[in-house]
Amino acid sequence: MDPDKQDALNSIENSIYRTAFKLQSVQTLCQLDLIDSSLIQQVLLRPSFWEARKHSLSVQQLSQALQELFQKAREENPGQVHPRAPELTLSLLTTMYNSKGTGFLQLMPAAAALITLSGDSPLSKYRALFQLYAENSRGGYDSGPRMTRRVLRKLLTDLQQIPTFVGESRALCPVESATRSCFQGVLSPAIKEEKFLSWVQSEPPILLWLPTCHRLSAAERVTHPARCTLCRTFPITGLRYRCLKCLNFDICQMCFLSGLHSKSHQKSHPVIEHCIQMSAMQNTKLLFRTLRNNLLQGRCRKKEAARRQQLLDQVNPKGVPHHAQARLLKKQLNQYKDKLQAIYTSQEERICRFETRIHKLKTNQDSLWTKLQQIRRDLQARLQPPGPSSSSFQNVGNKVDHSSTEKVPKGGDYLQIKNATEDASTGEPLPKLDEVDRSHRSHTNAEHALRNPESPETTLHSTRAQSQTQKMPQKVISALPSYQEGLKQDIPKMVPAEMSSPALAAVEKKEAGNIKERKDELEEEELQELLSKLMDAFNLETPSGPESSVNMDLYSGAQRVCRAFSALVDQIALPNLK
């Protein structure tokens, strides 16, 4: 493009007209205005290319397709197609969709750019674009080509590369906002061709440059029988603008795009654009409309404010800040979600640790409960009175007392016991030695108890007295064999019969005296030892508590046994001491 012409186009204030004029210059340079959309579909969308529409085309394949396309255009318009048109068009498409220089281009974006810059009407272009991008829904009641949100988003993204090529990407609105405006009020996931055509014909801001470019091309050679009020040019060529507030105020294309105005006409006044010549009836209607706006200025101001607000909404749609706010909220929600997930994970770990501790505590509680039950059974077994009841102990005590009183030896009995001992010294065994020993001990205890009625043995514990009374006869019995052995050792050997009777009598008398002395000494020592053992066995502390009153019968029985043994020992020991 000529730099001077490019600078002139950059001086246009309105971004939509500036973009449209630049694209019109590119269209004219590449001679794409000589090609219609049907020819493009015939060449680029044939079966060989259409099967690979989702894949990439090499630059050589696209160059051959463009050569064929312009060859057919040359046949329809002989002498108008420049030989370098295919080369310039290939360079244009490569710059738009192959910026990385890979050598491959997508078929659908290239075809969409050719259709958009073709010389067809906007309605034909919209239909061709819908057929190019729509997806066929198979089966169902409403089968046919449909366009989903994803497909519409891809179409608008591909078309945005066209104004970006001429450096006018800032004048476009976001793709997401345009997609929401198209699907506003639509409940289905896809739209049909009628809905798509009605939306694009409403001239959305993202595609506003496309119909403007078509109007510029259509009005390029049109003349209007009117004079420009600002530059006084007659006739007006190209677009004609007429003020709806100033009476008979016409503006040419150059003055309008340059932003010129007069004292009576301001930039804020509403104007109407004409790309074709107006008839007399249209001029009359426009005159009455101007008069109404001047007479009803309040109504005119309201309509102008509404029109300007509508234009502002189109240029700066409300969905943009809402969309940004929604994205911010979504980001914050994701952050909160991550935090809550981390908190939930930590709480789960704590719960697992608590459950493990609770399980351990339950196990310890069960083991402690088992131990307590065992201790309880042991205590019950220990607290229960062992052996027979107290009544049986009372009977045993009465029997022992009766037997001790009956078996107390008197003077003659003591001589009998002494004679029995002497008989045992001659070599004969002692008859019923255990019974005699038991009778001696019971008699001795009885006499000792009578002489010492306030002895400490009166407060013996039942269970310990019982055990000591059971062990006492065993001690006495164990001592008797040693006593018998001593007696047997003291028995002298039999003297021979050859000794004389006087000498034998003297010897026997002497030996009998010695034997008697030894026997008395041994008996005294044995009895004293038995007495000391018996006193040690019954030297116990008296228990205190409620059990003492319960076991008094057992204590009394033990006391009687102690008295009987003491009396028996005294009865045996006192004659020897004398």
UniProtKB/Swiss-Prot annotation:
Binding site for Zn(2+) 2: 243, 246, 265, 269
Bias-annotated ranges (Polar residues): 455-472
Coiled coil regions, renumbered to chain: 322-351, 503-537
Basic and acidic residues composition-biased segments: 399-410, 431-451
GO molecular function, one term: zinc ion binding
Cellular compartments annotated: Cell membrane
Keyword terms, alphabetized: Cell membrane, Coiled coil, Membrane, Metal-binding, Zinc, Zinc-finger
Zinc finger (ZZ-type): 223-279
KW Metal-binding (keyword) present: yes
GO terms under biological process: synaptic signaling
Positions of the UniProt region annotated as Disordered: 382-475
Stretches that traverse the bilayer: none
Record-level GO cellular component terms: plasma membrane; synapse
Pfam families linked to this entry: EF-hand_2, EF-hand_3, ZZ
Main location, first listed in the record: membrane
Binding site for Zn(2+) 1: 228, 231, 252, 255
Disulfide bonds: none
Protein name as annotated: Dystrotelin
